[in-house]
Every structure is written in C-alpha cells, then in structure tokens.
C-alpha cells in the first residue's frame, strides 16, 4: 500500500511538471514527455491567442492497474484529472477540466516512460453508406410540430455526466457520440426509426441506430434530418450557442470521428465544449490542445433547430 502511495506521488509530480510548463513556463525535464510538450505548446499558444490566463491548475492521479514485469519494471495504467482556473480578458473566471488515460513504466521508482494512451476513434461505420436519411410524410407530420429543444436541459446533462457514464444507457469505450446523443435526448429531442439501425436516431435497450453512437453517422444525420432531431449547418463556430453540436474530422479525410456539445461561450464569443472518450468540460472548441489534433482537422458546426425556430 505504501508503495502505491509513493507511485501515485511520482505520477502527480510528473503531471505538476506539465502544468508548471503551461502556467509558469517552467521547463519539462523528462525526455519521455516530448509528445506532452507538443500538446502543451499548442495549448499555451491557444491561450495566448485567446488572451486567457491559467491562474491556478492542479492534477490528481488515480492508479487503475499495476503490473511488475520479470525484469522488475513496474507498468502502471492510470488516469489524471486536470483542473484549470482560467481568467478571461474581463477578469471573469471559469474552470476547465479534462481527464487523461496514461501509461507509465518505472524501474526502482525511476521513470522510464510516461505517455497518454492513444485512442483510435471509432468514428466511421461501413453501414453509414446505406443509411436512409429520408423521412416519410407521416414522420414529418408526427415530429414536425412536436419538438421544442430544451438547451438548458441538454447543457445540464452534459455538465452532470461529462466524466461519468449514465447506467440508464448502454455505454462504450469510445463513447463520444453516444454521450452527445444522451445530451440531446435530455434536451427533449425525440427518438425515431426503431428498430432499423440505419434509419432515424434512437437507442432502446441493447440496440441503437448508427446515428446515435457513430460520429460520422451523426454528422450525416444532422446534415439531412427533416423530422424530430434536426439541425442547420452553419459556417463558423461563433454562430453556435449552448446546446449545439460540433463534429470533428481529425485527419481531414472526410470521415468524422468525434463529437462535442457546446455548453458555454467565452468572452470572444467562441464555444466551450463538453465531451467524452476524451473526457473534458469547458474545453475550447478547436481541440488544438488534444493529442488527436492534426493540421488537417476539419469541423462541422450544427445549430439545433426545432418547431419554434423561425425559417
């Protein structure tokens, strides 16, 4: 047990070193953190561009699994919960949080390597190509006059569950789009299309539509739906408001693989988002501070509309 506490302390010191670079410009001494340095450099530049200061930051480690190899090397899988107190141009404050899953190797309590565990987004499903996005006239009649989107309800759900999984739903290791669907449903968006997985937007018991759980399918659904949950694609992030959705194509290859929900706007009128898979809250929308970011990234901005929206 004492060894576990000691290891936890080592991991938190490593995290504090990363935060020291971000907040105070202190050097990151561990060569094993080259990848972390690139991410932190992007985050620092982003904060400077936004004229936002991090005035306080902390990190808490939770060790998930410890394995000792035959040669005495200790392998640790762990999570780090980061919390940043951010000060905007008008001195107003907000708290940004995110959780990283990491893997570290130590020998005799000396660090060998420590890095974030890469997650391959499962954002595309071959079934996407055969999804029917058209609506029958009776579906338009049934849903077209009934849906009023509760943006506050969607945001409140996103705030409550950003770093935990609601047992009322089936959840997955790659949970980003499932989480956004849950938020939208909490905002009153009606399910439709059951039991056809390639139609509509729904989750019931042990089955669900591709559009509910797959990032690319949700992007296609929001682009085409004319009944129930639907949206207008807008040109810029500034046009979004809390409760709206952003879809991400990290590689720029046309296959969207991540989804977030807008929960607030910063003083520059830019969205702050919540998400799962890369569990985070009040994160700047562009994801430049993510290991998944590439210079080829593309975004799709969706403003959710309902029956009260003026055409």
UniProtKB/Swiss-Prot annotation:
It comes from Bacillus subtilis (strain 168). This is Uncharacterized protein YhbB.
């Amino acid at each position: 047990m004492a060894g576990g506490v000691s290891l936890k302390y080592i991991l938190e010191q490593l995290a504090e070193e990363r935060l020291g670079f971000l907040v105070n410009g202190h050097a990151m001494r561990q060569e094993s953190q080259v990848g972390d340095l690139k991410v932190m450099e992007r985050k620092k530049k982003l904060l400077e561009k936004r004229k936002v200061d991090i005035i306080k930051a902390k990190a808490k480690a939770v060790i998930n699994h410890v394995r000792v190899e035959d040669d005495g090397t200790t392998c640790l899988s762990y999570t780090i919960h980061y919390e940043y107190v951010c000060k905007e141009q008008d001195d107003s404050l907000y708290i940004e949080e995110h959780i990283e899953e990491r893997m570290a190797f130590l020998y005799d309590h000396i660090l060998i390597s420590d890095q974030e565990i890469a997650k391959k987004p499962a954002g595309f499903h071959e079934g996407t190509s055969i999804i029917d996005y058209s609506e029958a006239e009776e579906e338009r009649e049934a849903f077209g006059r009934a849906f009023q989107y509760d943006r506050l309800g969607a945001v409140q759900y996103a705030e409550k569950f950003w770093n935990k999984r609601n047992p009322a739903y089936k959840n997955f290791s790659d949970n980003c789009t499932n989480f956004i669907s849950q938020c939208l449903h909490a905002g009153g968006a009606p399910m439709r299309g059951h039991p056809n997985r390639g139609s509509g937007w729904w989750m019931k018991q042990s089955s669900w539509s591709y559009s509910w759980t797959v990032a690319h399918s949700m992007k296609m659904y929001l682009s085409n739906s004319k009944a129930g949950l639907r949206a207008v694609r807008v040109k810029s992030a500034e046009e979004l408001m809390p409760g709206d959705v952003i879809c991400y194509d990290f590689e720029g290859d046309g296959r969207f693989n991540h989804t977030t929900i807008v929960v607030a706007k910063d003083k520059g009128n830019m969205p702050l988002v919540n998400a799962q898979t890369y569990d985070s809250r009040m994160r700047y929308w562009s994801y430049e501070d993510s290991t998944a970011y590439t210079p080829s990234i593309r975004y799709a901005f969706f403003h959710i509309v309902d029956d009260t929206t003026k055409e």
